[in-house]
Design a protein with these regions (language model features):
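Structural preference for beta-strand elements that scaffold enzyme active sites
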Residues: 19-21, 76-78, 102-104
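Conserved, mostly hydrophobic/aromatic
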Residues: 22, 51, 82, 96, ...
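Short, solvent-exposed loop/turn segments at secondary-structure junctions
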Residues: 26-30, 65, 84-86, 110-113, ...
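Extended, charge-rich helix/loop segments that form flexible
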Residues: 15, 115-183
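Membrane-proximal basic amphipathic "stem/tether" segments
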Residues: 1-26
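Acidic/histidine-rich helix-loop elements
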Residues: 28-39
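Membrane-embedded segments
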Residues: 76, 80-93, 99
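C-terminal domain-boundary segment and adjacent tail
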Residues: 38-71
C-alpha cells in the first residue's frame, strides 16, 4: 500500500499520472549467457507479477484513447514488444495469458519469411565464432577478445554501438564482412 501511494505521488501528474509504456524485445525460454540483457521466462514472469500488483495494465489502444480523454487510471502502464521475435508468442504470450495481462506486439514484417535483422546476425556470428579473438581492424571495427560469454557480450555491444546509426547499406555491408571474418 505504501509503495502504491509513493508511486502515485512520484508520478509527474500525481495519482492521475501519465502512461508508462513498457517495452520488451525477447523473452527466452532459459537464460542465455551471451544474451544476458534478454529476460528468461522466470524473470519475465516475476516482472509480470510485480507489474500486475503495482500498476494498472491497460491495452495500448485503450491507453492512448484514455490518455487523450484524461481518463487513465493512476499508475497506468501498457506492455509492448518490439520486433516480433518468435519467443514473444511461444514464451511471453503464455505468461501474459496466465496473468491476464494485455500486450501489444510490433512485428518487423520484413523478416516473416525468414532471414534476420542485422543486429541478430552480428550476435549469432560472434556467438558461433570459435576463435578467442575477432580481428575486424580491416573494416575499422577493431580487435575483440571473444573467448568467454562476457567477452562476446562486450564485443557485441561495442560493434552494434559502432554501426547501428550508419546508413543502412553501410551497416549491412559491415555486417556481412563481420560474418565472413567470424566464420
Amino acid at each position: 500500500m505504501i509503495l502504491r501511494t509513493i508511486s502515485g505521488m512520484l508520478s509527474p501528474a500525481g495519482r492521475n499520472g501519465l502512461l508508462s509504456i513498457l517495452i520488451f524485445h525477447r523473452v527466452l525460454a532459459q537464460r542465455d549467457p551471451v544474451l544476458d540483457w534478454d529476460l528468461d521466462a522466470g524473470d519475465f514472469e516475476r516482472r509480470m507479477r510485480w507489474l500486475k500488483s503495482w500498476f494498472n495494465i491497460v491495452p495500448l489502444d485503450e491507453a492512448v484513447t484514455r490518455l487523450a480523454q484524461g481518463s487513465l487510471p493512476a499508475r497506468a502502464a501498457a506492455i509492448t514488444f518490439d520486433d516480433g521475435y518468435a519467443d514473444n508468442c511461444t514464451v511471453a504470450m503464455p505468461i501474459l495469458q496466465k496473468h491476464k495481462l494485455p500486450a501489444c506486439f510490433f512485428v518487423a514484417t520484413g523478416f516473416l519469411d525468414g532471414g534476420r535483422m542485422w543486429n541478430d546476425t552480428i550476435i549469432e556470428s560472434i556467438r558461433a565464432c570459435r576463435d578467442t579473438h575477432l580481428d575486424l581492424a580491416a573494416i575499422d571495427l577493431g580487435t575483440h577478445a571473444i573467448g568467454s560469454a562476457t567477452e562476446k557480450r562486450a564485443a557485441i555491444d561495442t560493434i552494434i554501438g559502432r554501426i547501428k546509426y550508419l546508413p543502412v547499406n553501410e551497416r549491412l555491408a559491415l555486417t556481412e564482412k563481420l560474418t565472413e571474418a567470424a566464420s
